[in-house]
Amino acid sequence: MTYVVFLLSVMFVMGFVGFSSKPSPIYGGLGLIVSGGVGCGIVLSFGGSFLGLMMFLIYLGGMLVVFGYTTAMATEEYPETWGSNVMILGMFVLGVLMEVGLVVYMVMSDGVEIVVDFKNMGDWVVFEGDEVGLIREDSMGVAALYSYGSWLMVVAGWSLFVSIFIVIEITRGA
């Protein structure tokens, strides 16, 4: 399980490397969506199943609106890719090589604690059992969200629905 979290963390960083060296807004939005999905996978690996799914759905809904808006405003007939400019390609390759070097150092050496200190890993645990009893934070939060915050869900869903039509209207050019 540690290797899965380590691999997801590497993919998370690589998504942000792709975002930071974006040649066109289309690829920047794609990098953010990939990083969001991998980040939800990290939350899922620590036991926060419904919390990770809800975070991904809300994040993806908001990102699709922003992604559609930036694509509409910065439409290019021939968008630049990572390989079309030597400087952009060099920065992307440099970021990838730095991440690969860090991964090789962490896997091959015995002193992993030198790079990353895992003393407070209990702060990242979503599902934790004690002698008193177990209460799942994500299920209790979902119950509160649907019982007390039902109008908040309706307003949030309606806002995303209306914003999709706004983005469609902007892209149409009317």
Curated annotation (Swiss-Prot):
Per its UniProt entry, which superkingdom is the organism in? Eukaryota
Q: Which GO terms describe its molecular function?
A: NADH dehydrogenase (ubiquinone) activity
* Annotated EC: 7.1.1.2
Q: Which GO terms describe its biological process?
A: mitochondrial electron transport, NADH to ubiquinone; mitochondrial respiratory chain complex I assembly
Reactions catalysed according to its record: a ubiquinone + NADH + 5 H(+)(in) = a ubiquinol + NAD(+) + 4 H(+)(out)
Transmembrane region(s): 1-21, 24-44, 46-66, 86-106, 151-171
GO cellular component, as recorded: mitochondrial inner membrane; respiratory chain complex I
Against Pfam families, the record matches this protein to: Oxidored_q3 (PF00499)
The UniProt entry lists membrane topology as: Multi-pass membrane protein
Enzyme class name: translocase
Record keywords: Electron transport, Membrane, Mitochondrion, Mitochondrion inner membrane, NAD, Respiratory chain, Translocase, Transmembrane, Transmembrane helix, Transport, Ubiquinone
Q: Where in the cell is it found?
A: Mitochondrion inner membrane
The entry describes its oligomerization and partners as: Core subunit of respiratory chain NADH dehydrogenase (Complex I) which is composed of 45 different subunits.
UniProt lists the family membership as follows: Belongs to the complex I subunit 6 family.
Functional summary from the UniProt entry: Core subunit of the mitochondrial membrane respiratory chain NADH dehydrogenase (Complex I) which catalyzes electron transfer from NADH through the respiratory chain, using ubiquinone as an electron acceptor. Essential for the catalytic activity and assembly of complex I.
Q: What is this protein called?
A: NADH-ubiquinone oxidoreductase chain 6
Source organism of this protein record: Oryctolagus cuniculus
